[in-house]
Regions:
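NTP-dependent small-molecule kinase module
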Residues: 22, 128-193
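Conserved phosphate-donor/acceptor-positioning beta-strand/loop module used by diverse small-molecule
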Residues: 89-90, 113-134
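Glycine-rich phosphate-binding loop of ATP-dependent small-molecule kinases
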Residues: 1-63, 116-119, 167-168, 174-193
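ATP-dependent small-molecule kinase phosphotransfer cores
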Residues: 33-108
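Anionic group-transfer/hydrolysis microenvironments
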Residues: 7-9, 91-92, 96-97, 126, ...
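Conserved RecA-like P-loop NTPase ATPase core
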Residues: 10, 89, 157
Length: 193
């Protein structure tokens, strides 16, 4: 089984790239499990999503807590199933939304506990590009979807991605260019860390 993680800021193109990649892999006759987080098919993901539209520190922590439980639930329920590829959209980088130093503590705690892979992609998008995409495509914005939070979270997530040897992909470009980069790196080794 090849475990792939596609993570990044809001509006970095995570879902689009994961869908493109899963279509490509299925087109090669391989089986794929694709999970998005927060997932709305369970109470933890639904609560995480609900708190993302709330304001305040308690909503911030509640969103992070329910998000992490949602991801862990997916690992427990889906990672052991018989698929040739398992793709998770949003995984460890949700911890970057926590205040310092909790972001680093939570990231390293979860990275030590959950499965990791050589195929962990951080889609890096400039905050200005992300904000433009959000304003064009969303009717309602989540608590972190503003230029200030996008910039702050990007710096924290990039530092975590660099420190833990993620593949950082410039996601400011076209869908095709980003997909080509992901496929190029994915065609290398498929062993787990």
């Amino acid at each position: 089984m090849v475990f792939v993680v596609i993570d990044g800021l809001d509006a970095s193109g995570k879902s689009t790239q994961a869908l493109e990649l899963s279509r490509f892999i299925r087109g090669q006759g391989k089986t794929v499990l694709l999970r998005f987080h927060p997932a709305e098919d369970n109470p933890f993901g639904a609560k995480a999503k609900q708190f993302l539209y709330a304001r305040g520190k308690s909503a911030h922590f509640a969103a992070a807590l329910f998000y992490m439980v949602d991801v862990i639930r997916s690992i427990l329920l889906y990672s052991w199933r018989s698929y040739q590829y398992v793709i998770f959209v949003r995984y460890l980088m949700g911890t970057a939304y926590l205040p310092r130093p909790l972001d680093h503590l939570a990231y390293h705690f979860f990275a030590a506990v959950v499965p990791t892979s050589r195929h962990m992609f951080f889609l890096d998008v400039a905050p200005e590009v992300a904000e433009k995409r959000l304003l064009e495509n969303r009717e309602r914005l989540e608590m972190f979807e503003n230029i200030r939070e996008l910039g702050r979270t990007r710096l924290k997530a990039l530092s975590l991605a660099v420190a833990d040897d993620w593949t950082i992909v410039n996601a400011d470009g076209s869908v095709a260019m980003v997909q080509q980069t992901i496929r190029k790196f994915l065609s290398g080794s498929s062993e787990s860390k």
